[in-house]
């Protein structure tokens, strides 16, 4: 199949998707009750969306198209409140976090939908191991060429979003040593990582045609890239964030991306190049492993800096854009988190207080509902 045309959309509009954990209130392990929750929320109010994910212990919610931080945050709060009320009726809880702390992949059940069955048959046990939970942020672009320019310009900021959102230190009952262990599950897929360095939608169409001709991919959904174009929506989609423990953090991350995109579009501080990816994998690993304490290398200057410091400098450069976009509350929340620590640190702090892991997950569910 040919690559579809890129649908023009209003620049810098936002859409947020959150993958969420469904928890048993008995032991706070994952609960395979997605179908029940989908039925319970079928008549929800609001323009947002709820749909199943690859296994039956998770769901995905998606915002409507938003332009500013305040309305986005309020919509996410409304989504949270309606979901929490529906979950209570089913004796389940909902939580953020990039991984469940002690679930075992072999116990997960593939959601009965054609695409999920296809993924399970193709990837085997990796499909069940993909019971991990991420935040995806869409940013509107006027055409495919500008979408690809922005996609590559954003590559150096990918570690920012990994470290700020990181909330997955525990896997199958063990502290992995990573702030974001979730992304290790994504790395296992053969079409993950970075998009190819092409600059025009026509050239990207040629790449897509070659890939479909091999039979390796059937649609854009088969690419698990960190940032990918979404032509039917007219967006690029950032996919590296763990689902935060709160909707306020999710809204702040989305608006941080919006501010960066505005600065890149208006100021064009550099021109993206293939060499931007020389240190991409190293920087990505540092953010996953060490979070805000990681070190990154600037692809232009080759200088190393602490990731926390680089984010702080970026936030300072974005002040004017955040003011114009009415996102100062969002950027302040992220500034505070640079000193308070990310959600991975919060989860480890709960564990350090001698809480058993089920109690840590219960605390995360309470935090989600606040």
UniProtKB/Swiss-Prot annotation:
Keyword Electron transport found: no
Residues in coiled coil: none
Annotated InterPro entries: GCL_type2/YbdK_subfam, GCS2, Gln_synth/guanido_kin_cat_dom, YbdK
A GO molecular function held by the record: glutamate-cysteine ligase activity
Catalytic activity entry: L-cysteine + L-glutamate + ATP = gamma-L-glutamyl-L-cysteine + ADP + phosphate + H(+)
Keyword Ligase annotated: yes
Enzyme Commission number, as recorded: 6.3.2.2
Organism superkingdom: Bacteria
Keywords associated with the record: ATP-binding, Ligase, Nucleotide-binding
Any single GO BP term: modified amino acid biosynthetic process
First-tier enzyme category under EC: ligase
Role: ATP-dependent carboxylate-amine ligase which exhibits weak glutamate--cysteine ligase activity.
Similarity-based family: Belongs to the glutamate--cysteine ligase type 2 family. YbdK subfamily.
Name of this protein: Putative glutamate--cysteine ligase 2
Organism whose genome encodes this protein: Methylibium petroleiphilum (strain ATCC BAA-1232 / LMG 22953 / PM1)
């Amino acid at each position: 199949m040919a690559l579809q045309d890129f649908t023009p959309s209003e620049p810098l509009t936002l859409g947020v998707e959150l993958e969420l954990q469904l928890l048993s209130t008995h032991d706070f392990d994952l609960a395979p009750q997605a179908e029940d929750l989908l039925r319970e929320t079928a008549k929800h109010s609001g323009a947002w969306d709820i749909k199943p994910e690859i296994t039956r212990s998770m769901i995905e919610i998606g915002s409507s198209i938003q332009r500013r931080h305040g309305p986005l945050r309020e919509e996410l709060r409304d989504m949270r409140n309606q979901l929490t009320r529906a979950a209570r009726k089913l004796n389940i809880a909902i939580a953020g976090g990039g991984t469940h702390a002690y679930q075992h992949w072999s116990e997960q059940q593939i959601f009965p939908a054609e695409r999920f069955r296809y993924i399970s048959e193709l990837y085997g046990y990796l499909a069940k191991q993909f019971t991990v939970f991420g935040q995806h942020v869409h940013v509107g672009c006027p055409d495919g060429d500008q979408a690809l320019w922005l996609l590559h310009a954003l590559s150096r900021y990918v570690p920012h979003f990994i470290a700020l959102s990181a909330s997955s230190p525990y896997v199958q009952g063990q502290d992995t040593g990573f702030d974001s262990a979730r992304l290790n599950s994504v790395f296992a897929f053969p079409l993950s990582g970075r998009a190819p360095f092409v600059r025009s939608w026509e050239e990207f169409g040629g790449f897509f045609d070659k890939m479909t001709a091999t039979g390796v991919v059937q649609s854009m959904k088969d690419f698990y890239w960190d940032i990918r174009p979404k032509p039917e929506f007219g967006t690029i989609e950032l996919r590296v964030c763990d689902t935060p423990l709160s909707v306020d953090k999710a809204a702040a991350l989305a608006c941080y991306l919006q501010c960066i995109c505005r600065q890149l579009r208006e100021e064009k501080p550099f021109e993206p190049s293939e060499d931007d990816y020389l240190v991409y994998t190293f920087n990505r690993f540092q953010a996953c492993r060490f979070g805000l304490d990681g070190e990154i290398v600037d692809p232009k200057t080759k200088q190393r800096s602490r990731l926390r410091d680089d984010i702080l400098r970026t936030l300072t450069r974005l002040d004017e854009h955040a003011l114009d976009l009415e996102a100062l509350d969002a950027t302040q929340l992220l500034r505070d988190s640079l000193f308070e620590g990310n959600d991975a640190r919060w989860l480890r702090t709960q564990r350090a207080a001698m809480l058993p892991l089920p109690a840590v997950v219960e605390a995360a569910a309470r935090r989600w509902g606040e």
